[in-house]
Amino acid sequence: MFSLKLGKNKKKKKVPKGDSELFGSEASVDDKVSLTQYNYADEREKEKPKKRKIELATAESETIALKRAKNNIGDDSIVQELEALPEKVEDKEYEEMPVEEFGAAMLRGMGWTDENELEDSKSHSKKLPHEQIHPEGLGIGAKSQEMSNPVSVKDLVNDFMPVKKVPKQ
């Protein structure tokens, strides 16, 4: 088991405490303000940074989760469950899983069945949703009036209005 301690390593700059030493007796207000800001920043640097630990587990040692469970939790049932889990995956286990069937198994896990495949082959004769007419200015899924109300040729003839030029007055 290894552990690394991470923290900030900053060199602290020493600044004289009194502004009279730095600026003399005739220090301006702006100089005093900047000095107090600098001293405030120096005080913040003096605070100790929080040290963090990163736990690394080697192949021979116990898993990090198991160690934390043993240290933090007094409940033995959780520790027993963690100990029952397999520690290491063997190459043999990878060879037993057929790669060719992985995609089909994933689709079955998402609810895909062979019936879906038959339905898809029948529906290829229909237009796909992205191949349908999409009038300009309408959002996805919106239906235009032309699509919702089919217009016959007779209606178009009766509604025809010729354009006439009107003289200006």
Curated annotation (Swiss-Prot):
InterPro entries: Spp2-like (IPR045166), Spp2/MOS2_G-patch (IPR026822). It is found in: Nucleus. GO terms for cellular component: spliceosomal complex. Residues 1-28 are annotated as: Disordered. GO terms for biological process: mRNA splicing, via spliceosome. It comes from the Eukaryota. Pfam families: G-patch_2. Keywords: mRNA processing, mRNA splicing, Nucleus, Spliceosome. The keyword Mitochondrion does not apply. Signal peptide: none annotated. PANTHER family: G PATCH AND KOW-CONTAINING, G-PATCH DOMAIN AND KOW MOTIFS-CONTAINING PROTEIN. Involved in spliceosome maturation and the first step of pre-mRNA splicing. Belongs to the SPP2 family. Associated with the spliceosome. This is Pre-mRNA-splicing factor SPP2. It comes from Candida glabrata (strain ATCC 2001 / BCRC 20586 / JCM 3761 / NBRC 0622 / NRRL Y-65 / CBS 138) (Yeast). The lineage of its organism: Eukaryota, Fungi, Dikarya, Ascomycota, Saccharomycotina. The gene is SPP2.
